[in-house]
Amino acid sequence: MLIPYDQLQAETLTRLIEDFVTRDGTDNGDDTPLETRVLRVRQALAKGQAFILFDLESQQCQLLAKHDVPRELLE
C-alpha cells in the first residue's frame, strides 16, 4: 500500500526519512550533511520520484524510488 507522504505528520515523515538516509549502505561514502540528504528525499517524494510503501504483512514502511515500486501499485 502506498502512503501519501503529505498525509503523514511532519515529525513522522522526518523520522522516516532520517531513518532511511542513515541506514547502512545508503550513504555510499557520501559526506553530504543529514539535512541535505533529508531535503533530497523530500523533494523526490514531492516530485513523485519516490514513494512510501507500507507492507501490511511486516507492518513496516519503506522509501522506494519510483522504478522500484511494483507497477500495480502505481496504477
From Swiss-Prot:
Pfam families: UPF0270. Transmembrane segments: none annotated. It comes from the Bacteria. InterPro entries: UPF0270, YehU-like_sf. Belongs to the UPF0270 family. This is UPF0270 protein PP_1747. It comes from Pseudomonas putida (strain ATCC 47054 / DSM 6125 / CFBP 8728 / NCIMB 11950 / KT2440). The lineage of its organism: Bacteria, Pseudomonadati, Pseudomonadota, Gammaproteobacteria, Pseudomonadales.
